[in-house]
Amino acid sequence: MAHTRSAKKRIRQAEKRRLLNRYHISRMKTAIKRITEALKNKDIETAEKLLPLAQKLAYRAAAKGAIHKNEAARRVSRIYRKVNAAKASLSQ
């Protein structure tokens, strides 16, 4: 257990940051999972509607420092590629 006031404050701050990071990452992952589930069910229209939200949440998590900006870009890129591939396979 921390003894100094500054160490105790740091523990409080770290816990707050951990919870906020978890919140942002969880929302982003849930949005991506909803798109993935829609693609599994061949529901491309729903997946396309959810794309902007997932993108927004990923970039917001990066802006808040929960994830690196390159990770956010990579996640968005991958989910867009999946949706576009599903759309292309449906049109053929």
From Swiss-Prot:
Pfam families: Ribosomal_S20p. The keyword Translocase does not apply. Signal peptide: none annotated. GO terms for cellular component: cytosol; small ribosomal subunit. The keyword RNA-binding applies. InterPro entries: Ribosomal_bS20, Ribosomal_bS20_sf. One of its GO terms (biological process) is translation. It comes from the Bacteria. Gene3D superfamilies: Ribosomal protein S20. Binds directly to 16S ribosomal RNA. Belongs to the bacterial ribosomal protein bS20 family. This is Small ribosomal subunit protein bS20. The gene is rpsT.
